[in-house]
Amino acid sequence: MTNTNTGAEKVRWDLGLMYSGLDDPQIDADVAALVEMVKKFKTSHKGKLSTTLGKAISGYSEIEMLEGKVKVYLYLLQSINVAEPAVKTKIADVDKTLCREFGENLPFFRIELVALDDATLAKLYADPIVAKHRPWIEHARFFKPHFLAEPVESALTKRAPFGAISWGDFFDELEADLEIEFRGDKKTLTEVLYMLTKSKDADERAELSRVIARGLKGPFSKYAAQTLYMVVGDNSVENRERTFKHPMEPRNKSNRIQDEVVDALHNVVRDMGGPLMRRFYRLKAAHLGLKKLKWSDRNAPMPFADTTVVPFEKAMTTVLEAYESFSPTLAGLIRKSIEEKRIDAPAEKGRRAGAYNYSIVLPGNIPASFTFLNY
């Protein structure tokens, strides 16, 4: 994406562990298999969890692993080219099929799981499979007050591809396609933001801030506002229907943390963040020789900042040495990830912004981990 070669251009992942390509017929075969699996799951276990919970958990795990294989593969593929029409079409087709069939056949499972009485569940824990999944079961039962009727849960799952998730994907595509013109060259948002944080020229930073502001105005800002409205609105309505007391409650419960702990963190950040920020910017202005920072100076590099371009291979060596110093096991996992080509590193136009690691368990209980970067 930038003109600086770092060696990251050659670091691309190999997704052959899952499929050979977007046209691999095994993708459709796996989707068809999932459809049959969820239908059989409902027939075998609906209304029978008091006697079949162990087998149900095993079957549900198989469904989740195969679903993960399909969906994670497509997500990884889309990350390197967000607007690729063929990938978008495939994702849409898969989502519509799976959400329809999952919505029709799976909602009963969690609803009936949380409805099991304590005495019945205590007996079921004699099954090694059920006992192994006890933390997962208890966590699911923690949400018992918030489940809706089965027909409602079914409808929500079926319409999921056409709601907030779709708007989020739409925004990612808009952001990846956004072009900002700077001194005659068209650049991506990620590139100009990077330049803004690295430029030591105050006039250049001011110019970059202006072109970024212009680029974010107009149609992009309207679509961004509409996306936020749809996502927040969808979440707000569902939270009320599920009787959550406030927007953070579902996340806090999912993280198994009390509201009071999160509130304490928020309060400390609110009370101390402002003064610390002002202190930091006063110190930064002094280092830059300025009485007052302009908006475009907020992320300016310090005069003593090292602007050396670090080749990807050297950066990876540093990471490995750091992990090796406290956990040879973790260092070994990273080294294995490099050897098996599980990293996609270059910063290029059209890629998803940011970085992430996606770890999953594939069918056959095969662990896999993929790392996405914009180096």
Give a label for each model feature.
Residues 1-322:
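A well-structured
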Residues 184-201, 238, 308-375:
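Active-site-adjacent "gating/activation" loops or surface patches in catalytic cores
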